Amino acid sequence: MENVPYKQVIGCIRYLVSCTRPDICFSAGLLSRFMLNPGPKHWQAIKRVLQYLKHTKDLAITYSLIQSDSYHGILSGWTNPSSTLSGWSDSDWGGDVDNRKSTSGYVYTLGGGAIAWRSKKQTTVALSSTEAEYVAAALAAKEGIWIKAILEELNLFKVPTLELNCDNQSCINLARNPKMSDNIRHVSFKHHFLRDLIEDKKIELKFTPSTSMWADFLTKPVSSQKHILCCKNIGLLNFSKVKEKNMMF
């Protein structure tokens, strides 16, 4: 494996992830963990990612635009539900078989298209799926508050309360409860600022069924059907088929 350009290819893939391809975000993060000592199976996995990219080269993030006076500036006209700023936060539980750490994932959409996404392995081992989702929601909240501040500073439009979707009801109840329970006393304080954001009504955690969790493919391998569904609902569409419609890219 010494003559295989593993690191170089990973760098190219991660560049695509950071620009316009959230659909390979989880794969890029997972394969990056083996850069120090990659094996043949890791190189085969990279080639599968490259084959996928070759056959989906027409995928692009698309944003819908509808005429209206509801918003200000360049965002005037976005009135359909997908036009609001919305976020989805998800996590697996102990997906890393080596150290049993979980993977957090989030995606934010505006105008029906993704504007921010991330897949990140958690730094500590979560003792429950609720804890893993709680840590993931805190990570997503940090990004969401930053996006909200940017939009308001640019005077595009105000987001009174940011909607963050989560598919774990126990996590939502935990975030809404200001008391410190035995289940989370060991959780780092940096994650508990999520409670302050909810109490100040800056963020609202909303329950969403797992079937409608569009950040699912950022945390774990999913079926091809779910993968396509996630891509569609974050605006990652075949651009050659939509470029003639009333879309903005």
Report residues per predicted region:
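C-terminal reverse transcriptase regions that engage the nucleic-acid substrate
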Residues: 1-60, 64-65, 209, 217-219
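Beta-strand cores of modular interaction/reader domains in eukaryotic scaffold and signaling proteins
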Residues: 25, 60-62, 109, 163-165, ...
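Conserved cytochrome P450 K-helix E-x-x-R motif and the immediately C-terminal K′/meander segment
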Residues: 45-86, 91
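Conserved helix-loop functional segments at active or binding sites
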Residues: 55-59, 114-116, 146, 150-153
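Short, well-ordered loop/turn elements at secondary-structure boundaries
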Residues: 10-12, 19-20, 55-57, 79-83, ...
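Conserved pre-motif C helix in the palm subdomain of viral-like polymerases
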Residues: 3-23, 92-95, 103, 130-146
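RNase H-like nuclease fold core
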Residues: 13, 84-130
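RNase H-like nuclease module associated with reverse transcription
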Residues: 34, 68-84, 102, 120-249
